[in-house]
Amino acid sequence: DPPWAYKVWSKKGAGRSAESHYPTMDIAAIKALPVGELADKDCALFLWITFPMLREAWGVMDAWGFTFKTVAFVWIKQCRKSDGLFTGMGYWTRANAEICLLATRGHPKRAARDVKQVILSHVERHSQKPEEARRRIEALMGDVPRIELFARASPPGWDVWGNEVASDIRLAERM
């Protein structure tokens, strides 16, 4: 889940924007990350995006050396304390879903055929993804080396990198 930088349209929106929660990166900086050098020759990329970043996501996947395959997950967000649908931000419509794109390089093997696309789950803190997504990635890909970039936690069986965790690797930006 890259820390996408968004255009803010109002002072009210600025207080709820990603920039008010954590440092963000512009598209050029995200593309410059050496993800392609880190990735195995046969692997999958799960890239969380919000709909305003859909076009940019294709450029990021290309820059990292991956080919889009499908939408892996559609997270329908529920309110923190109820099962009602969460109301997020949005200029045209209020966002209450996020998608995770699946891209590959080489020929990774699929370990399971019964992994579902839709995740109905409560929101937690800003930008935190549901644990169910991690479980589904593990089921889909099987017991392979895994790394989460921009991680917020260090789950068992995963290497992590990010500014909110003790990183297992060091990334040098190619800028």
Task: Give short role names for the model-derived ranges.
Residues P2-M175:
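Class I S-adenosyl-L-methionine-dependent methyltransferase catalytic core
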